[in-house]
From Swiss-Prot:
It comes from Salmonella typhi. This is Glutathione-regulated potassium-efflux system protein KefB. It holds the Pfam family TrkA_N. It is a multi-pass membrane protein. Interacts with the regulatory subunit KefG. The chain crosses the membrane at residues 4-24, 29-49, 55-75, 87-107, 111-131, 152-172, 177-197, 207-227, 230-250, 262-282, 284-304, 324-344, 356-376. PROSITE patterns: RCK_N.
Amino acid sequence: MEGADLLTAGVLFLFAAVAAVPLAARLGIGAVLGYLLAGIAIGPWGLGFISDVDEILHFSELGVVFLMFIIGLELNPSRLWQLRRSIFGVGAAQVLLSAAVLAGLLMLADFLWQAAVVGGIGLAMSSTAMALQLMREKGMNRSESGQLGFSVLLFQDLAVIPALALVPLLAGSADEHFDWFKVAMKVLAFAVMLIGGRYLLRPVFRFIAASGVREVFTAATLLLVLSAALFMDALGLSMALGTFIAGVLLAESEYRHELENAIDPFKGLLLGLFFISVGMSLNLGVLYTHLLWVAASVVILVVIKMLTLYLLARLYGIRSSERMQFASVLSQGGEFAFVLFSTASSQRLFQGDQMALLLVTVTLSMMTTPLLMKGIDKWLSRRLNGPEENDEKPWVEDDKPQVVVVGFGRFGQVIARLLMANKMRITVLERDIGAVNLMRKYGYKVYYGDATQVELLRSAGAEAAESIVITCNEPEDTMKLVALCQQHFPHLHILARARGRVEAHELLQAGVTQFSRETFSSALELGRKTLVSLGMHPHQAQRAQLHFRRLDMRMLRELIPEHSDMVQISRAREARRELEEIFQREMQQERRQLDGWDEFE
């Protein structure tokens, strides 16, 4: 693709994303389906703006690559070892069972047995990009079903290597073309990457971080991710697997959070590009000429994978309320099918339109998943939020609540319990099914649902409530909810949880002044106790704590992100000097009796 064409394609991709995703969100079908529909619109079977789909699809895999690197950063080797049973037990069972059933059905559809085996393996795989994105949107990444889903996806990525090696064997060209020496060299190169990364990455990043230039650190992070992807691609292995391993190797390093922040903006944009590319690859000509075959294939594929996953989730001990989510989020075909089927086609395993039919089936199955998840969400809402005969009497009645509490994790539970102990009428919204089930057993009236949906907030009593307390784990959800309340429920008094200074700044800029940084108060309290343990009088330590709190809050308001780094550094130094002067005046002016004030009074 020429430079000018690449620039034009980039503009078209950005325009499609900007136009389609907000429209999809307004229609309530989700960002992923919006990207897919945008791809169909600008692709060769839509308006025809872009025709070189294969090249763009390969480039767009970088979105999955960046996503897997961030996931690797969140898992250390010890955590992976803990997941070994679910990875090699449930993951292997899912791939083998689904592949066997699907291969048998393809043989009944006049596929050669070799092509049926490849087709079954390819269709058994799920879309890592789509599944992880949907799990994050639905809050599944912290639940037991989400962890199991990730384990299955990880095994599927590991299965890429033997699956690709199997294709030439099935094609009957093993003796003529299959070079075992090359395979051994690839394994050796992979081992060198693991060992080298284990001992070299941290010293290299330590050297780069010492420069103090953030842009260089970001560039080094991009270099690491892209190099790992290219290295694995050169070996004929999964690019996503290579970057996942790089992330795991850095998961226990002191640069983990900085690496994640550097990559995150690129990940989101490139994931969108990937979904648009998948939409562009949909062959509407094949769909039109084989409509019944494709429609039946999509239904059969989704049903078989859902049944297999549901059965495995039940055997693994996943709660019944979470099994449907787990089964549906992995029910689609995946991006690996494009690679595997192309390799099989080059070995002439497929006949006629067989490859095109399989690819159309995979693409359409990916489009069904957001709709399927939306339908299951509604079903779960009716099931979990409806009245039950064996429900215990709730602590408070939820008719016309005074307060809506969003999130019932450790932070939200403390707030909700305090409000209920003071006889306040509250409604609690939580999108973790496991937490909803557990809390309802203890008599809490917790409702399942995504609070970023206006209709759910309205049915929860937001129009009648006086306040809303937002305790979401994800900062993006918090800011989205703030904007939603300001637009649709301007009367609500908004109180929010801030995970740190960055989110506190965002809340202030959005006009939210009542917020609590989750670790700030507890850290101040422990600091006060430390001062007392060092011999400071309890009253002085208490006043020092109050002075520090007031000054820090003032600095938080003054040091907004619009200021340059030098201005912020200068102002922070002034604040530190000001704090020291306040404490010195306190020491000079207050000469109190050591037994004149008791911190436990």
